[in-house]
A protein has these predicted regions:
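Duplex nucleic acid-engaging cores and interfaces of nucleic-acid transaction enzymes
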Residues: 81-84, 95-105, 109-352, 356-460, ...
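Single-stranded RNA-binding regions, centering on S1/OB-family and related RNA-binding modules
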Residues: 581-585, 589-753
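A glycine-rich phosphate-binding loop feature that marks nucleotide/adenosyl-phosphate handling sites
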Residues: 210-218, 353-357, 415-416, 440-447, ...
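Short, ordered loop/turn segments at secondary-structure junctions
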Residues: 69-71, 272, 355, 368-369, ...
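Single conserved hydrophobic/aromatic residue that forms the stacking wall/gate
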Residues: 1-16
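Charged, low-complexity terminal tails
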Residues: 31, 48, 53-56, 67-111, ...
Length: 753
């Protein structure tokens, strides 16, 4: 065994010298202490709160649970802060593991020095570690490696002491062998060795990378195959395109990447001559000032063009793509969150229409409780169906509206949507019906209709009817319906298929988890798809909960959840507070109060003279008394956590609120809008359907959504549309321009002078 400095500073750790493995666990503790400190400083959060948070998460707690039920331990950190802590700690853990691995790999080659070890230990980011490791990575044998094997390394070293080329030529004679037959071959081999040595220096790579990231220009041109592969000229904007990468927007980065991948564009990075000269002069400083300058420059040019720049360009393009992916995923996350948080239209009987041409419009009735009641088909497109079919469709429509007391008609926005909307608007007008309709984004409805969960819910119904049911339920409870569909099929992303799919999936899953746990779920009505996003519930357990309901009837109290197969004490702890039972035996089971805090709730109620039963029966009187109750004093006297008592107090004082109620209800319509009726300057209300980096797409009632470009959102400069617009938001806009031939409409929100 030997004593070695730990990777975290001055502490000493015991290491088995035969395996390079750290064998005393104390070093890992030191490493974590340093990580906690770094994260605390970066996020401006007390170090003990960072440590407490990570220990909870390491112990199996979920972010929603920690944020809501462990406020005293974390210092009342919210989900975003907890997520940031976790992300940074995971990065630093990976960094420390990579440092250990790199030290081991270099040591196995017998090339590890104290100086090299210290450089690795002091590295702050992964890229720094990789730059240090670069010369030691296993790679294909190069010409320089062959030159070294032929004994030319000493000659390469002479380039730093010789004064001119003649001196080098004389020295090179001593290196002539069977494998190196001439002076020229010897000099060429030595120059290759120097070029490779230059390319492997971490400080050069780091500086050149910085210059490329800050100053390089990306250039795209149409490939030779462009005319053949891009008939619709989708990439026309990039056929002769250049831009500084520092200013390049994420959607343009991803568009260029896709065009290159499809062999439509050729792409490369270019440096200004002044930046190239700056790099060459930086490297030239390592050589002496003498008559070999021209030779040194030749070596530097070879090292840059053949070895450094191709590698750095790949790294920079990857960094550029990663930046674009992060921004694209962030846009998707915001859009998905706002889509899931759309206000539900509760207790409304819905007639759902999934438009179609030849096969007709599929119709489903969904009652106000979300239950499917009946289905039929309307043939209503005048250009395709005969007058009798259209008349029959009108009669069926009116009969269903009367029979089920329909409140809202929900129309999918896909094929034949415009004709279906015209049909509905005309019937409402002709019959003076007190009825509204809305156009629903049906993206993903067909994916749902063919899914396993749809087959489980409606085994006896055709896939087309299931799609109509989804369109209807989406307005009654968007969250409950949309969680059944892969979020990538919902249609609110930007270049979503061009980003890292595992990162995208993880990010979107986190968004769904955040929203679902924020809203909570009724354990007696929620689908397994919704339940699977609740804290502590995996898909198998979610299905077991639904199965338990079928076999035993509704859950009567939260304790009963422990009877479900796969639910142990830890899982129960994580999920219980997020599952509610409105008609349960215990009124607290319909609140956000966690079962572990029921004793606090009962003690608090006792202080105002109420038992749980009395509180349930005399709710208004109990809440009147609670208004004047000093819960802070109560927490101090009983040594209860102040944050927990505050949450318990507020839950007893008010009904459980649905955060979605704070969002605008969808825009209901009774008449149709036609592009021919639009005039520049006309004011309208619209619903934001998608927010992207260059603006937002707004549903103003036409077949296609209109574009509100980022430059038209405000008179003030807007750098990010998502800061002022959200999916589902209802906004007032004016018509800026109309292209009737292409069916395109431009909007503005700018104030008029």
């Amino acid at each position: 065994y030997e004593i070695m400095p730990s990777l975290v500073g001055s502490e000493m750790c015991i290491r088995d010298s035969t395996s390079s493995m750290i064998i005393n666990k104390k070093c890992k503790g030191y490493a974590m202490e340093k990580i906690y400190k770094i994260v605390a400083e970066e996020l401006k959060i007390p170090v003990d709160k960072v440590e407490n948070t990570i220990k909870l998460l390491d112990d199996g707690a979920t972010i929603p649970f920690v944020a809501r039920y462990r406020k005293e331990i974390t210092g009342n950190l919210d989900e975003v802060q907890i997520g940031d802590i976790l992300q940074k700690v995971e990065y630093l853990r990976n960094l420390e593991e990579r440092k250990e691995e790199v030290i081991r790999l270099i040591e196995e080659q017998g090339k590890l020095t104290d100086e090299l070890r210290n450089s690795i230990v002091e590295a702050k980011i992964l890229q720094e570690v990789e730059d240090i490791y670069f010369p030691y990575r296993k790679k294909k044998k190069t010409k320089a490696d062959i030159a070294k094997e032929r004994g030319l390394e000493p000659l390469a070293e002479k380039f730093y002491t010789a004064n001119n080329l003649e001196e080098i030529q004389n020295l090179a004679k001593d290196f002539i062998t069977e494998e190196v037959p001439t002076v020229e071959d010897a000099i060429e081999g030595a120059m290759l060795i120097i070029a490779q040595n230059i390319s492997e220096k971490a400080e050069y790579r780091e500086r050149i990378r910085e210059i490329y990231l800050k100053s390089s220009i990306i250039e795209a041109k149409a490939s030779k195959k462009a005319a053949e592969l891009d008939e619709k000229k989708v990439y026309n904007d990039y056929y002769e395109y250049s831009e500084k990468i520092e200013k390049m927007a994420s959607h343009r980065i991803l568009a260029v990447n896709r065009g290159e991948k499809e062999d439509i564009l050729t792409v490369h990075l270019r440096l200004e001559d002044s930046d190239r000269e700056k790099i060459e002069n930086m490297i030239l400083k390592e050589f002496p000032k003498n008559d070999l300058v021209a030779t040194y420059k030749e070596i530097i040019k070879d090292s840059l063009d053949r070895l450094i720049i191709p590698s750095i360009e790949r790294e920079v393009r990857n960094a550029l793509t990663e930046r674009a992916e992060i921004e694209s995923i962030a846009v998707f996350k915001d859009n998905l969150k706002n889509l899931l948080l759309q206000a539900p239209l509760k207790e409304k009987n819905v007639l759902a229409l999934d438009p179609g041409y030849r096969t007709g419009c599929k119709v489903a009735v969904i009652d106000k409780y979300g239950f499917y009641r009946e289905n039929t088909v309307f043939f209503l497109v005048e250009a395709m169906h005969n007058p009798k079919q259209i008349e029959d469709a009108k009669k069926k429509f009116l009969a269903l509206v009367k029979k089920y007391e329909i409140d809202i008609v929900s129309i999918g926005n896909g094929t034949a949507s415009r004709e279906t909307e015209t049909f509905v608007a005309n019937i409402i007008k002709e019959n003076k019906l007190n009825l509204k309709y809305l156009i629903v984004n049906e993206a993903g409805a067909s994916v749902y209709s063919a899914s396993k969960i749809a087959a489980e819910e409606f085994p006896d119904l055709d896939v087309t009817v299931r799609g109509a049911i989804s369109i209807g339920r989406r307005i009654q409870d968007p969250l409950a319906e949309l969680v059944k569909i892969d979020p990538k099929s919902i249609g609110v992303g930007m270049y979503q298929h061009d980003v890292n799919q595992s990162k995208l999936d993880e990010s979107l899953d986190n968004v769904i988890s955040h929203v679902v746990n924020n809203v909570g779920a009724n354990i007696n009505t929620a689908s397994w798809a919704l339940l699977s996003h609740i804290s502590g519930i995996k898909k198998t357990v979610a299905k077991n909960i639904v199965e338990y309901r079928k076999e035993n009837g509704n859950f009567k109290n939260r304790k009963e959840i422990l009877k479900v197969k796969g639910v142990g004490p830890k899982a129960y702890e994580q999920m219980a507070g997020f599952l509610v039972i409105p008609e349960g035996e215990n009124i607290l089971d319909n609140t956000v109060i966690h079962p572990e805090s029921y004793a606090i709730a009962e003690a608090l109620l006792e202080k105002i003279g109420f038992s749980l039963e009395k509180y349930n029966n005399e709710l208004n009187e109990a809440r009147e008394r609670l208004k004047s109750f000093d819960y802070k004093k109560f927490a101090e006297e009983n040594n209860f956590g102040a944050e927990t008592v505050k949450d318990v107090y507020e839950a007893l004082l008010k009904d459980r609120r649905d955060p979605r109620d704070d969002f605008e209800k969808p825009l209901l319509k009774s008449d149709i809008l036609n592009i021919d009726n639009l005039e520049v300057g006309m004011e309208l209300e619209g619903t934001v359907r998608n927010v992207v980096k260059f603006g937002a797409f707004v549903d103003i009632g036409l077949k296609n959504d209109a574009l509100l470009h980022i430059s038209e959102i405000s008179n003030k400069y807007i750098d990010d549309p998502s800061k002022v617009l959200a999916v589902g938001q209802i906004i007032k806009v004016r018509i800026k321009d109309v292209d009737k031939d292409r069916g395109r409409v431009g909007l503005t929100k700018k104030e008029q002078n």
